[in-house]
Amino acid sequence: MLSESLTKTKLIDPLILTLLQNIRGHRSNLENLKSIKIDPKLSNIISDKEGKELYIENEFHKAKGFRKLHIEVAEFSRRLKILHCVFFPDPHYDIPIFGMDLVKVNEVVSAAIVDLSPSSKNQNLKYDNLLSTIDKSVFESEREIPGWGDIFSQNVFFASLKNESEKSAFCKIVDHYLLVLIKLSKSSILDHDQEIIQERIDFQKNYCRQQMKNEKTSLVLLKYFDKKWVDEYIKKVLFDF
């Protein structure tokens, strides 16, 4: 297993690259954007072991209103490709949690999900109307939210993508959600109310706890790493708080 510092993804999947470019573009519009350093053994990993080829690249940043902007690109055994992104807000600001995941097995997109998840009570009332008007009629295979998914908003979008038009439509939805997020972040002001700050901390902790209930994440990683490494990766890289 080899850890490297990588500056751009080695994946050439067109859909992942389109989404990645879009997310990075919106991220660049945030104020005071700075990179975050993390243990190299957890950030960028490459293995060329036959049958267990592995590539994981992580990007970590912070910005005004956001404590952590995380993007993960991964490929397992040259079959399974993943794009994972979570923008965690700074609890001192009234900003939702942006989350997006794309899972592709060979050429089939089995899961595509995006949401602006509330980070405090009734926060979603501020932006629900900005998301609810999106036309999703093109999608034929919307998926059911898992039991632990009560952390998501009522406008969470989750589907399998069957064709190029659905892939294109999903990219547009992600772009729209990011536009709303950036708009909310630019209008948000620093809060000093300790009660609401604590509420936002508690919401983020619950978001991370619920995400950790998704056993598919650990099951994939356990095929390539031992349990100790997987637990550390999930708790320190994916869903830390």
UniProtKB/Swiss-Prot annotation:
Q: Which residues form the signal peptide?
A: none
Disulfide bond positions: none
Name its GO BP terms in alphabetical order: phytochromobilin biosynthetic process
Give the catalytic activity.
Answer: (2R,3Z)-phycocyanobilin + 4 oxidized [2Fe-2S]-[ferredoxin] = biliverdin IXalpha + 4 reduced [2Fe-2S]-[ferredoxin] + 4 H(+)
Which keywords does this Swiss-Prot/TrEMBL entry list? Oxidoreductase
Q: Name the top EC class.
A: oxidoreductase
Judging by the UniProt lineage, the source's domain of life is: Bacteria
What function is annotated for this protein?
A: Catalyzes the four-electron reduction of biliverdin IX-alpha (2-electron reduction at both the A and D rings); the reaction proceeds via an isolatable 2-electron intermediate, 181,182-dihydrobiliverdin.
This protein is called Phycocyanobilin:ferredoxin oxidoreductase
Which species is the source of this protein? Prochlorococcus marinus (strain MIT 9515)
